[in-house]
């Protein structure tokens, strides 16, 4: 079965921080590379989410149009992902004509099937600004947790969603004045009608979701579903227009149009084969835990409401939050590392950052914490002393003592035990990757390196078979080079280049290399941080400008 792999669409009002990167695009990239390395037919798709109130607010604050914000920040996002070597098969954007057409088409199917109703509601209205206050245009105190920065549709602090009129002490986000309440008519989606279908979805696929995703779904499905308002009154009408005459001045709620973006980008990529992909592709999705409810409840219900065959989530991997130095990332307080901080290379190479973010990937049910001290220690201990030392030591020995020729003696019981140990670890690696436990799979690769180092150390004491030990260690390096491809692909290629080995699919077991001439240009895989880089890291111990819009 083909795999349709997606990462939660990054919102384009700002550049991504480290938590955004590990939570969706980097995790999706690792899994996509793994699937392709297995020989599976798969596509990895993402793109920028460009509609909604956050974009309008940013445009108002900067005195430009929403489109200008999107076009500028879209390039910044792609620049960051390119630096991280994220290998999308397609990266699109939701403000395209193709997306508008598909959203309107799917809506009309849902509407014609009777799953929307017109409801007159009361909504906050700012008389000073002359507009209805939807979502981020209204802020106030959350009635659930008391946070004073809750938005009109959701509290980022506790995760609750609600009607904006439930906010306490509401105020306009633009001018801070107190709003009045006015009547307006919107379109509401009958979510409750799809409870049985959603329960069946969970029974069928829920065991393939990360534990936190399962917990969130069960929490939602235990509650009463209220009709969901799927249209908005916005100042610039920045969104997909509602294709009904009565609602021509309104646009769709961003969480209605954004997930359809996955289908838009798939359609833009595969063209006439779109229908076939919709029929038999397995949808695998990566996201932070705050997006789980939209992807396991609301979006699947929308697809069911069309009455047609579209891929619904089969596998889902959701991360917990990544903190920065024991605090939440904050754009307003300039707390954390953001994408453009890394692009210049002043804080280290991308392979180091890929490795460390995946090492601390918050894939259990607990948040993870980024610290520069642990980052530096991990690079030194894992990449330089373990992986780098193992590769360099073996290759340098074969180059200088064996004339770059890998030549084995007859395998003895100790050799066979080492091979058995490595193959057991390789099986564990494959199992963890299938479970999308990426952090644990990466740990297994480091275990293989440690086992290889132990084996080589045994060989140092053997006068007659010392060269043989190093030559068998070469086979371990070849396997490690392949297994690292999903995680740190540039390093993987460098290992294979020095070994003079071709890129291959994942083997059934470790291939024993004999009678082979390795490469001649052997270099250290990693270099320690420079004094300048360490000094640059120290700058982030205090508030810094991220170089992005607030």
Curated annotation (Swiss-Prot):
A motif ('HIGH' region) lies at residues 10-20. ATP binds at residue 331. GO terms for biological process: methionyl-tRNA aminoacylation. InterPro entries: aa-tRNA-synth_I_CS (IPR001412), Anticodon_Met (IPR041872), Met-tRNA_ligase_1 (IPR023458), Met-tRNA_synth (IPR014758), Methionyl/Leucyl_tRNA_Synth (IPR015413), MetRS_core (IPR033911), MetRS_Zn (IPR029038), Rossmann-like_a/b/a_fold (IPR014729). Its EC number is 6.1.1.10. Keywords: Aminoacyl-tRNA synthetase, ATP-binding, Cytoplasm, Ligase, Nucleotide-binding, Protein biosynthesis. CDD domains: MetRS_core. It catalyses: tRNA(Met) + L-methionine + ATP = L-methionyl-tRNA(Met) + AMP + diphosphate. One of its GO terms (cellular component) is aminoacyl-tRNA synthetase multienzyme complex. PANTHER family: METHIONINE--TRNA LIGASE, METHIONINE--TRNA LIGASE, CYTOPLASMIC. This is Probable methionine--tRNA ligase, cytoplasmic. It comes from Encephalitozoon cuniculi (strain GB-M1) (Microsporidian parasite).
